[in-house]
Every structure is written in C-alpha cells, then in structure tokens.
Amino acid sequence: SELLRIKLLDKSDVQNQTKEKPAYKKYFSHGTSHHLGLDTHDYCDLDMPFEKNMVLTVEPGIYIKDEDFGIRLEDDVVINSSGDPTNLMKNIPIQIEEIEAIMNNG
C-alpha cells in the first residue's frame, strides 16, 4: 500500500502481478532476512525453528533504478532464552531527523 501511496505502483501493477512476479519486486530485489554469524551471510535451513542465540537480520529496502537511488535499513535480532527476538540495533538512529541532526552536529 505504501508503494501505491507514493505512486511508485498503480492499481494496474497490483492487478497484473503474479505469485511468481509480485509488483513490489520492481523496487525490492533481495530477501527480507538472513542468518548472521561467523560469516556475514550465514545460511541455515529455512524450515529450521528459531533457537536461542540465533541472530538474524531484518532488511527492508527500496531501490528506484530510474533515480539511481536505493536504501536498506537493517536490524539485527538475537533470539533470547524465552524465544523472543531482541533488537540489537534498537539504539541506532534510523529516523530522518535523528540522522540529519547527527550529520549537522558531526
């Protein structure tokens, strides 16, 4: 719905999408997550249940080729002993105003 709101997609894009080629893939060319460990991209069985101390990324992004623009925000989360995720990046600023303030006061 956000891509519709900012007019990167229109209703016909959504109506004509297929399961194999969803409309959002025009602007999102990678996966949403991967395991993180000794290697930057650790690979595990995707059907494996989460376990304590597993670390995964959460990587929403958008890439607008016509404007040579792209951005991806990454959070890294660890599965804690209760099985819930803990965001390891929670204190890192990601809001526009926070980043601009840091840049202006650099």
Q: Model-derived features: where do they sit?
A:
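Charged, cofactor-coupling segments
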Residues: 32-106
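Active-site cores enriched in adjacent His and Asp/Glu residues with nearby glycine-rich loops
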Residues: 1-33
